[in-house]
A protein has these predicted regions:
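ATP-dependent adenylation/nucleotidyltransferase module used to activate substrates
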Residues: 2-139
């Protein structure tokens, strides 16, 4: 029988440069949330965020949802202000990428409801004549 000994000093250690980078990311996130809150309050916008549930659009989605959550919690905007998210299923994705947006949508909707955010999340597909396969093979 082999016994592995856990040594914490070889696992999960961040150097100063990595810590500074993480702190920069946190400051950037916080300032971006504040900028979105400013738009929500001063310009009275209704945000529409197109999301693919990939890395980039998910970061934007998280920032906007957090700005709504904070603005509502602080009484800066009305809780019935809509937040609109939309995802396009191109009908040309791999099976995991086809499944993940639906999986994520349910969880995002539950989170928004829990936080009192009036979110509308629409998932759309192109019409038959606009499908990639039809356009690609149809000449």
């Amino acid at each position: 029988m082999t016994v592995n000994v856990f040594t914490p000093d070889t696992f999960g250690v961040l150097d100063d440069e990595q810590i500074q980078y993480q702190q920069l990311l946190i400051r950037t996130f916080e300032s971006t949330v504040e900028e979105i809150k400013t738009l929500l309050v001063e310009k009275k916008i209704i945000a529409h965020v197109p999301v693919s549930q990939g890395k980039d659009s998910t970061v934007v989605e998280i920032i906007v949802i957090e700005a709504y959550r904070r603005a509502i919690a602080e009484g800066l905007i009305e809780s019935d202000r809509p937040l609109i998210l939309s995802t396009v299923d191109t009908l040309n994705e791999s099976i995991p990428m086809k499944m993940y947006p639906t999986f994520a949508k349910r969880r995002i909707e539950a989170y928004a409801k829990e936080k009192g955010i009036n979110m509308y999340y629409d998932m759309v597909t192109p019409g038959l004549n606009d499908e990639y396969f039809v356009k690609f093979t149809g000449g």
